Amino acid sequence: MAARLCCQLDPARDVLCLRPVSAESCGRSVSGSLGDLSSPSPSAVPADHGAHLSLRGLPVCAFSSAGPCALRFTSARRMETTVNAHQILPKVLHKRTLGLSAMSTTDLEAYFKACLFKDWEELGEEIRLKIFVLGGCRHKLVCAPAPCNFFTSA
């Protein structure tokens, strides 16, 4: 079963809120500056899974040495898969299925930063609302509390 999350920029607080699409769940916000992040709970992000990295709102598998679980980014407005434009993560996931070495932790961090923030900075509010689908991923994001009413299905 896929985990569906709403990613919403709150301009009043300058934070990026990641929330479950379906219900009111517990969670967190990620700072828009990528600098002042509140520390995650120890059970949510183990130290050996990249907890020291700046994007702690991502699932713990995102920075594991084995690479992330299947992950795709979609724009809520266009419902397009944007990850394929970069042609980076699909190759990494394919290599992973073949047992080959995956992308380095530094490369993964840069990749996610580019996907999450570059378009928002350059294009403004056009694609600020995105849905993250973790297909069959057992790893959980630490999300901001409150339901997300912008998108009811993906």
Swiss-Prot record:
Q: Which GO terms describe its biological process?
A: DNA-templated transcription; symbiont-mediated activation of host NF-kappaB cascade; symbiont-mediated arrest of host cell cycle during G2/M transition; viral genome replication
Q: What is its main location?
A: host cell
The entry's keywords? Activation of host NF-kappa-B by virus, Activator, Apoptosis, Host cytoplasm, Host G2/M cell cycle arrest by virus, Host mitochondrion, Host nucleus, Host-virus interaction, Modulation of host cell cycle by virus, Transcription, Transcription regulation
Instruction: Kindly give the InterPro entries that the UniProt entry links to this protein.
Output: Transactivation_prot_X
Coiled-coil annotated spans: none
Task: State a GO cellular component annotated for this protein.
Answer: host cell mitochondrion
Q: Which parts of the sequence are annotated with region: Mitochondrial targeting sequence?
A: 68-117
Localization per Swiss-Prot or TrEMBL = Host cytoplasm; Host nucleus; Host mitochondrion
- PTM comment: A fraction may be phosphorylated in insect cells and HepG2 cells, a human hepatoblastoma cell line. Phosphorylated in vitro by host protein kinase C or mitogen-activated protein kinase. N-acetylated in insect cells.
Q: What's one Pfam family here?
A: X
Task: Tell me the function of this protein.
Answer: Multifunctional protein that plays a role in silencing host antiviral defenses and promoting viral transcription. Does not seem to be essential for HBV infection. May be directly involved in development of cirrhosis and liver cancer (hepatocellular carcinoma). Most of cytosolic activities involve modulation of cytosolic calcium. The effect on apoptosis is controversial depending on the cell types in which the studies have been conducted. May induce apoptosis by localizing in mitochondria and causing loss of mitochondrial membrane potential.
Listed under subunit, the entry gives:
May form homodimer. May interact with host CEBPA, CFLAR, CREB1, DDB1, E4F1, HBXIP, HSPD1/HSP60, NFKBIA, POLR2E and SMAD4. Interacts with host SMC5-SMC6 complex and induces its degradation. Interacts with host TRPC4AP; leading to prevent ubiquitination of TRPC4AP. Interacts with host PLSCR1; this interaction promotes ubiquitination and degradation of HBx and impairs HBx-mediated cell proliferation.
Q: Hey, which family's this protein in?
A: Belongs to the orthohepadnavirus protein X family.
What protein name is recorded for this chain? Protein X
Q: Which gene encodes it?
A: X
